[in-house]
């Protein structure tokens, strides 16, 4: 019998994190209980089922499903989603993330058209496009992003597009060149955590490189808002988070999301603590005082949560 390829489930769990520079010790069966403020309703509803059917018929993936987002029920129930392009297999092993690791397939040349037609059929006004890391591609997948933006604007002229990009490690010049003629309405790249925790939480990434990516895009497109996101609960100190926020402002970043980290499984990074809503509220005030144009900070906030609202609140047309 022929051997079967590694399953997505295996690539998500212990096999994914086993080779990280800082090993993940599986958490005990009993983990920190979720506080009441983190409890969300089940994502099972007719609206959710209908949107999943539309996505499957178009052979599309959403980060809402792949990353086990706690807001899936709310977003899908409202008929919206953040679309994930370039497949659902990542070349990185970030131990906080529930997206599968492995060897991805070649990009689908028809994906941009399929996605644009799907968005048009859903009559969406604002979409977020993200992707897995594609270290196997010369430009990290940037040209594919640009093709998707072009197709979306062709099929949906009134649509606004936010992209949430990987770090394009070692490929920044090629990546930014791809967006020169086809920039998004919002450029988002998440720093995720504080520099001290990068080796543990983002092996293969570099804090200063990510800052430089945001700064370089802003230098080329000063009129386009840049955005980043942070997770709390990995063992950081609040003053470290404030330091990252100041670094982001120096890089020209204008929009910020801050949310609670939730471990996808016992094989992922454990939650060090559940941050109370009051601390998120204080960080929101701190961020606005630093000069961010919009800060979404709360336990259930994720990078693309209410992305359309933040875009319009800062004057996006």
Curated annotation (Swiss-Prot):
GO terms for cellular component: cytoplasm. GO terms for molecular function: 4 iron, 4 sulfur cluster binding; lipoate synthase activity; metal ion binding. It comes from the Bacteria. Keywords: 4Fe-4S, Cytoplasm, Iron, Iron-sulfur, Metal-binding, S-adenosyl-L-methionine, Transferase. It is found in: Cytoplasm. Pathway: Protein modification; protein lipoylation via endogenous pathway; protein N(6)-(lipoyl)lysine from octanoyl-[acyl-carrier-protein]: step 2/2. Its cofactor is [4Fe-4S] cluster. [4Fe-4S] cluster 1 binds at residues 64, 69, 75, 304. Its EC number is 2.8.1.8. Residues 1-28 are annotated as: Disordered. Its main location: cytoplasm. Residues 76-293 form the Radical SAM core domain. It holds the Pfam family Radical_SAM. Binds 2 [4Fe-4S] clusters per subunit. One cluster is coordinated with 3 cysteines and an exchangeable S-adenosyl-L-methionine. [4Fe-4S] cluster 2 binds at residues 90, 94, 97. It catalyses: [[Fe-S] cluster scaffold protein carrying a second [4Fe-4S](2+) cluster] + N(6)-octanoyl-L-lysyl-[protein] + 2 oxidized [2Fe-2S]-[ferredoxin] + 2 S-adenosyl-L-methionine + 4 H(+) = [[Fe-S] cluster scaffold protein] + N(6)-[(R)-dihydrolipoyl]-L-lysyl-[protein] + 4 Fe(3+) + 2 hydrogen sulfide + 2 5'-deoxyadenosine + 2 L-methionine + 2 reduced [2Fe-2S]-[ferredoxin]. Belongs to the radical SAM superfamily. Lipoyl synthase family. This is Lipoyl synthase. The gene is lipA.
């Amino acid at each position: 019998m022929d051997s079967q390829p590694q399953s997505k489930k295996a690539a998500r769990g212990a096999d994914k994190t086993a080779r990280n520079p800082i090993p993940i010790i599986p958490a005990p069966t009993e983990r920190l209980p979720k506080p009441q403020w983190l409890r969300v309703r089940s994502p099972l509803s007719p609206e959710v089922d209908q949107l999943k059917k539309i996505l499957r018929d178009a052979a599309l993936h959403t980060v809402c499903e792949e990353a086990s987002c706690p807001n899936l029920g709310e977003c899908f129930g409202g008929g919206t989603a953040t679309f994930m392009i370039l497949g659902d297999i990542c070349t990185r092993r970030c131990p906080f993330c529930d997206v599968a690791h492995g060897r991805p397939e070649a990009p689908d040349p028809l994906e941009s058209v399929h996605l644009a037609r799907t968005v048009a059929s859903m009559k969406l006004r604002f979409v977020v496009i993200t992707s897995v890391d594609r270290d196997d591609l010369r430009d990290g997948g940037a040209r594919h992003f640009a093709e998707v933006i072009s197709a979306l604007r062709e099929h949906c002229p009134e649509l606004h597009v936010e992209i949430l990009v990987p770090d394009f490690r070692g490929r920044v010049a090629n990546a930014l060149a791809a967006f020169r003629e086809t920039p998004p309405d919002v450029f988002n790249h998440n720093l995720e955590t504080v520099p001290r925790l990068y080796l543990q939480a983002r092996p293969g990434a570099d804090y200063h490189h990510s800052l430089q990516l945001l700064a370089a895009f802003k230098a080329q497109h000063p009129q386009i808002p840049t955005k980043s996101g942070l997770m709390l609960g990995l063992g950081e100190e609040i003053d470290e988070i404030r330091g990252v926020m100041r670094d982001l402002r120096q890089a020209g970043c204008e929009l910020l999301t801050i949310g609670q980290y939730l471990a996808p499984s016992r094989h992922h990074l454990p939650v060090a603590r559940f941050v109370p809503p009051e601390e998120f509220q204080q960080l929101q005030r701190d961020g606005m005082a630093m000069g961010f144009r919009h800060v979404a900070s709360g336990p259930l906030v994720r990078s693309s949560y209410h992305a359309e609202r933040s875009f319009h609140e800062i004057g996006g047309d």
